[in-house]
Amino acid sequence: YKVNADSGKDKEISDELSGYLERLLKIAKDSEGAFDPTIGKLIRLWDIGGENQKIPEEAEIKNVLKDSGYQKVSLDGTTIHMDEGCSLDLGAAGKGIGCDSILEYLETQKDVSAALMNLGGSSVMTYGSKPDGSSWNVAVTDPRAENDDDYLGVVALNGTEFLSTSGDYEKYFIEDGVRYHHIMDPSTGYPAKSGVTGVTVVCDTGLEADALSTACFVLGVEKGAELLKTYGADGLFVDEDHHVYLTEGMKERFSLLADSYSVEDIIE
């Protein structure tokens, strides 16, 4: 909040925050802005999942978008400069950052050899190997499930890995038959319309898994899969027609459970 309050000025930040922002800004650039940590004002304007959620006026959206854009943030070591009016929001990577912090802690605990951590369902991390050597199995939500215990399938994690899911079913409201969800397309100022309903990413760091799942939701299947390649991450995309698209690495991890879905190849 202090950083946002001091937009337009140079501000000293911690080494830790600087490191996180450097990684997030790289993902923003690599995704051509599909992930953007500067859309805080836009997220607050829609307030989806909050008490004041609404469809904003077009003029309101344009007004907050002029203050958005990852290019408005520059880092020089631990000195940050944001254009005046720019507002950071790290919510799209918050759980992933939390997972990375947990890993740092676990690595200092000599009496902990293995663990599975669930941060609210959308972010999961595994640490070490199970005693019997088998994979950790993590259920993935069916984006259109009628019951909470209806799962799309299971993803196998091995050793220390991070899984993040972004979907249009987590926070949303429906007005005039249209679903307005919380994952914003920074280029339009509206909820992303890429044809996907859910994306799951497996990566070797929590921050990247979290931010990449958001970026891939905005980008859609083909562009999202290309982005994951550059990070050596595995991905699963669910579209509106009940198709599941798997990257090569995810094919070895994923087992489909939901009968109403079919697995398709990604067209490259």
Language-model features, listed with the residues they occupy:
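Mature catalytic core of soluble alpha/beta enzymes
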Residues: Y1-E268
